[in-house]
From Swiss-Prot:
PANTHER family with a match to the protein in the record: ATP-DEPENDENT RNA HELICASE (PTHR18934), ATP-DEPENDENT RNA HELICASE A (PTHR18934:SF119)
Protein name: ATP-dependent RNA helicase A
Domain notes per entry: DRBM domains cooperate for the binding to nucleic acid but not for unwinding helicase activity. The helicase-associated domain-2 (HA2) region is essential for the duplex RNA unwinding helicase activity. The minimal transactivation region (MTAD) mediates interaction with the RNA polymerase II holoenzyme and stimulates transcriptional activation in a CREB-dependent manner. The oligonucleotide- or oligosaccharide-binding (OB-fold) and the repeated arginine and glycine-glycine (RGG) regions are dispensable for both RNA-binding and unwinding helicase activities.
UniProt short sequence motif Nuclear localization signal (NLS1), positions renumbered to this chain: 586-595
Outcome after substituting residue 608 to G: In MRD75; uncertain significance; unchanged ATP hydrolysis activity
Helicase C-terminal domain mapped to chain residues: 636-809
Originating organism: Homo sapiens
Region (OB-fold): 958-1074
Amino acid sequence: MGDVKNFLYAWCGKRKMTPSYEIRAVGNKNRQKFMCEVQVEGYNYTGMGNSTNKKDAQSNAARDFVNYLVRINEIKSEEVPAFGVASPPPLTDTPDTTANAEGDLPTTMGGPLPPHLALKAENNSEVGASGYGVPGPTWDRGANLKDYYSRKEEQEVQATLESEEVDLNAGLHGNWTLENAKARLNQYFQKEKIQGEYKYTQVGPDHNRSFIAEMTIYIKQLGRRIFAREHGSNKKLAAQSCALSLVRQLYHLGVVEAYSGLTKKKEGETVEPYKVNLSQDLEHQLQNIIQELNLEILPPPEDPSVPVALNIGKLAQFEPSQRQNQVGVVPWSPPQSNWNPWTSSNIDEGPLAFATPEQISMDLKNELMYQLEQDHDLQAILQERELLPVKKFESEILEAISQNSVVIIRGATGCGKTTQVPQFILDDFIQNDRAAECNIVVTQPRRISAVSVAERVAFERGEEPGKSCGYSVRFESILPRPHASIMFCTVGVLLRKLEAGIRGISHVIVDEIHERDINTDFLLVVLRDVVQAYPEVRIVLMSATIDTSMFCEYFFNCPIIEVYGRTYPVQEYFLEDCIQMTHFVPPPKDKKKKDKDDDGGEDDDANCNLICGDEYGPETRLSMSQLNEKETPFELIEALLKYIETLNVPGAVLVFLPGWNLIYTMQKHLEMNPHFGSHRYQILPLHSQIPREEQRKVFDPVPVGVTKVILSTNIAETSITINDVVYVIDSCKQKVKLFTAHNNMTNYATVWASKTNLEQRKGRAGRVRPGFCFHLCSRARFERLETHMTPEMFRTPLHEIALSIKLLRLGGIGQFLAKAIEPPPLDAVIEAEHTLRELDALDANDELTPLGRILAKLPIEPRFGKMMIMGCIFYVGDAICTIAAATCFPEPFINEGKRLGYIHRNFAGNRFSDHVALLSVFQAWDDARMGGEEAEIRFCEHKRLNMATLRMTWEAKVQLKEILINSGFPEDCLLTQVFTNTGPDNNLDVVISLLAFGVYPNVCYHKEKRKILTTEGRNALIHKSSVNCPFSSQDMKYPSPFFVFGEKIRTRAISAKGMTLVTPLQLLLFASKKVQSDGQIVLVDDWIKLQISHEAAACITGLRAAMEALVVEVTKQPAIISQLDPVNERMLNMIRQISRPSAAGINLMIGSTRYGDGPRPPKMARYDNGSGYRRGGSSYSGGGYGGGYSSGGYGSGGYGGSANSFRAGYGAGVGGGYRGVSRGGFRGNSGGDYRGPSGGYRGSGGFQRGGGRGAYGTGYFGQGRGGGGY
């Protein structure tokens, strides 16, 4: 095989070109591989090899490139020596026509229902078909982005990136703000004679009502439209935000000028200057280290009315990389005999390394034929599959896919398209002796869908997952064989894999495209480009109830195949029907006084519960008018469940509810009712955050006489099919996350679902017999529902997607997003670019820096990613990864009321920190589970903690650490440490300092009781779920008035969630952008005033600049963390000192009655010999907290190992448990110091002595669950 490299070199030499090879090590020390990429000038393709040694990697990369040259007819296949280069099958372009017969929806159904309730079925069949070869209309939806970026390129202005000193938003967008934008927009409307009207949508229940305003305007001089959709707590704010987005877009398109007047800022509440008690000795040390770092400090201003800026510019910058002029495309290549597409690596050993495609195809065909003849169970399953509606369309589907690069399959719920279409393709290739040419990846919107569908398909093929069918979701993979296989995965997993290209995959099937999440929209842009560059690839788009015309147009008028479902009709009813059938009378309204932040706001959106037809009785109209439209009526759901009993039609009931809180409350509500809590009912929750074992229960049949009631979010709306569901009760709501960029505000709103969502939910009934769907919204409300939900790309920050665009080398961020099916607003794109430049993730040429490359690989918010890197530098990487991972999931506290009880508050110790509470919970749980699964369950029940959340946090943390280690960070800086939250702990001080960096600009100042001030003195409240929230009207005094927080939540009031107390020195160091001094007072970010010496403040801002410079050096070469030069070590020690509360004169032990009248929390055990959770040399697993961590305990029978159960993984397992056999003890063999002589911190085994990486394999696509330690 080595000759292939010479062949390519000779071929290039004849054309006066030279192949360029780039090789790098990937993976960690124990399983290192080498990735080689080869490029040839003039060809937009990168050949790739991934092997265990450099020579094979180079040969495989050359071979891949030669195969590409054969495919594009640059080389004839017979000219190539026998390297196993296969010619692609010929591609025909015959246009295909597809069936578009009308779908019959039955209008009547039997059943014991009152005849006056029979409703007309809607006729919603409207999709036709068109030939693929017909060119579509010009696609110019992203023209605004294209215009802006083309003008920017023409000017070729080298941005000096000085906007760091400017307000994040206004300065970036021509100084247009909430206050001045609406007036300018009105002027523009008058001049252009535009009738601009805001379209308002109300979201949330009465006590948490807010509004969305949206508007589309046509710009004559550009010949295009721009669109904005923004959120506000009332109509006025929503309209102002919408106007602001429109004006900023007009500014960037050159239609309106920058604002030149004085920006009037609303005067927020002023903060009194805070006196910082800094010792003379510490100030002297600060000045010394600044001198050592050769930094110059500005003297105080001569005139106090002209303050000086203390911020020091960047001390180190990444060298700009070469600007990417070519618009990149993710590379694709067809399946090849020695390439495993699921691990993105070459097969260099074993029989498959040298097998020809013909041999592979013949072996797999013989195996399938033998199985079909001998396996009687399989024959029975095949007969079942024959009955699925999609089976009738098999030949039509296969023909369309073979003739067209892109095909859309629109199939009614339950027709079998998700499980059958991939198998049709696979079996067709195997039976036609082309097995080696087929590998199919199928994306699902959620992990439960990917796993359950993969398990179902494996069952239908008479196999276990891991043979011809597998899955890969975050934290868990069972990979199929390298050839003739189907891989089900989440969209996020596929996007992570794209860095290695879509190599070795013949078909990409994207299921549920109507969901319009940001990842699916991003994937569709990637695939559209791939199809244009590589027409041989096959893309299949599938969904149930979408208007496919937009997707059809986007993919060049591709054909649409309509598949009709089972003929069981589903009768649907609305709120008025449900009330009349059940004779429901609402209970008396609860008169309890609302909290102050739940009040206010006028509701001028019509209450549709007051609109009821004359055909309903007066009792029905009265009951309906008494129901609050914004609340989910639990009592009506109970009444419907009792009504369903009277129908005597057996079947499961699926109840759609918006969010985990309602599911949990409804479950408890039903279980406490003697009727529904009895053995006659099985109440099951279904939510993405519950363990897989719990999720699987919803598929299990129940005994005769038992009714299964499934309480689910919209997770059950798509892909997963629960066969025995006959009844659907639909709240008609769902929970969405809305983010407003200009004020950094997050809002979790319960909103009305769209008509598309309701149609999907209705379709879940009637799989086994005629079904019933009860919508808990009135007919009048249904008529007002949106047809589709707003795409996620319009309501979420874009910086994570922007990083992916750069990592995949897809060109400019704006230019790429302009190609989206519905491009995001221009101002959102510019903000994403600015955020990444500010973090040093992009260089002067807008290409990824080494830091940006690491951040792009971390599946977490980029600012948190940089915080984790800084954590590694301070050797507190594990704690920072734990906190970052915990932010991905709900809090682990199980809490009945809104405020936390003492059992949960005690985890914060005396740190006044929600983040420290999370860290302590995780630490205590991690210790408890050393005693096995039963000990873990007991601990979680006793402390009222959600075990599933803690397990998922652990998995996420391990994955984040794995990525950092694979990026070259030393394992030592990511070791687990013990923290104390009740006494001095400098490591914990540093963690809090870095947290202040990670959550910036979320800083607040405590005034009184729950009242706090956020940026620019705006009023807000401490969130009720915080450990810092006082009980009732209790007034609290904290050791420091300053806090950082995770996010601002907009309810009726604005509240800060996830709060941690910080010192003013920590703010100056890591949570500030603009620092000014007049010689007496230091002003931070224009609102926080500190009484601190000018010199001390200047030295601290200098330390920040030095720290940023060190991050630049470390990300170029992470291994240098273990051998920093003395000056940097002293600088880090200085930051450690400044991070201590005592450095700012703050005593955390002040105020022993921290949480009101309750008992003082018990002190946590000191971690000395033999006491506390981690008992020195005699730890739970027989010693070896650090040593056993990787001496084989975890992998051999660990989580996902041979025992394949939580008990085996989290408890003792087969091979000695998670922390393994006695190998040294956490503090040495007999409680010695951390790095003591008798084994020490890491024991004699070290961090990673396992024989393999178990479940994590090679990144997302892992090597299955197999052996070895972690």
